[in-house]
Amino acid sequence: IADWSGNHIQTFSEEIRRYPSIEEMCLSKSGIIQFNLRTMVLKDENGNELNYTLGQYEGDSTFLKVMKINILQGLSEREALKRYSTPVYINEQYARLLVPKGENPVGKPVRLYDTEFGKMEKEGEPIAIIAGIVENLYTGTLRQEVYPSLTYLTHTPPYNLVQIRLKKEHRAEALALLQQTWEKINPNVPFEYQDIYEEF
């Protein structure tokens, strides 16, 4: 459920958190459907340029759990947020393409492996540090290679999305209750949601 103004999503999430029909939820600045993409140019061993699409996700400390993305190596989300101002998880594909074989990237700056990323970091802002490696998340078609991706953990609003995992039973009633709550908090914006399972 999105509110691109970021004005009401926090209030909405606090209101619905107590609903028994909600299994898990997280706040995020981008989702698995609405996420940022950029082109990443790498060179093969012969010096030929290869273009890749890099996916970038951003959510709170429960984002990986709600999306059922497992951490394969590195810190837990809680530990990462304690240790780093801007913790980032790289996926298996990112590690395969950018991290030298046998090297442990955890605790190192993202810009060490991705020079374009370093150019985009703003002066005076905390450096993005790799907190761990997560499993690949397939968001394209079965014919597309999985995107290398970065997942940022954040604890600072504004958030634009609340992503909810509903319990299977009473789903229709749960959606009706979410709509009713949304209309009470945010009456001027229509209630709209995307079902990830339907989209994919």
Regions found by a protein language model. Give the residues of each.
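Structured, solvent-exposed hinge/loop segments at the ends of secondary-structure elements
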Residues: 1-96, 101, 114-117, 126
